[in-house]
Amino acid sequence: MTPVQRRRLAWVLLALLASGLATALVAMALERNIAYLYTPSEVLRGDVDAQSRFRLGGMVVKGSFNRPVGSLEARFEVTDGDAQLAVTTSRILPDMFAEGTAVVASGRLQDGTFVADEVLAKHDEKYVPKEVADKMGDAHRKHDVPVTAPEVR
């Protein structure tokens, strides 16, 4: 191998090493920012790392919403048809938030309660987020409840 070929090989190997390192760093950064969607059943079953940030999806239980007068602190429960999980948030809730509607909340589990730093609500009476619809459909099939296909946008 000539000196020119050796130098070229060294540069190619260095470029491959640098691109591999860059790919690994990007993958690690993205992994830390991913928030997976779980249902209350999965959370209560222990499928979630208690220290991790994740999204909780389901329906707001009717009669569970509570907000003290003059406070932003809101408490409600989310269900997937199998289990219910208490949720608290001190953020402003979206206008479309209501009991009996689908929500996706982002946050962390703390002492058995999901502390949400963001709550997203459905857009209209036919819309349910696809991930929530899929997981709710699984719960309905498990309990032999007829599954109505919501419109997914």
Curated annotation (Swiss-Prot):
GO molecular function: heme binding; metal ion binding
Entry binding sites for heme: H123, Y127
Chain segments annotated as transmembrane: 9-29
Residue ranges, Extracellular side: 30-153
Keyword Zinc: no
Record's GO cellular component terms: plasma membrane
Membrane among keywords: yes
Main location as per UniProt: membrane
Cell compartment(s), UniProt: Cell membrane
Alphabetized Gene3D superfamilies for the sequence: Nucleic acid-binding proteins
Source taxon at top rank: Bacteria
Topological category with respect to the lipid bilayer: Single-pass type II membrane protein
A GO BP annotation: cytochrome complex assembly
Cytoplasmic side: 1-8
Protein keywords: Cell membrane, Cytochrome c-type biogenesis, Heme, Iron, Membrane, Metal-binding, Signal-anchor, Transmembrane, Transmembrane helix
HAMAP family: CcmE (MF_01959)
Protein role: Heme chaperone required for the biogenesis of c-type cytochromes. Transiently binds heme delivered by CcmC and transfers the heme to apo-cytochromes in a process facilitated by CcmF and CcmH.
Family label: Belongs to the CcmE/CycJ family.
Protein name, UniProt field: Cytochrome c-type biogenesis protein CcmE
Gene from which the chain derives: ccmE
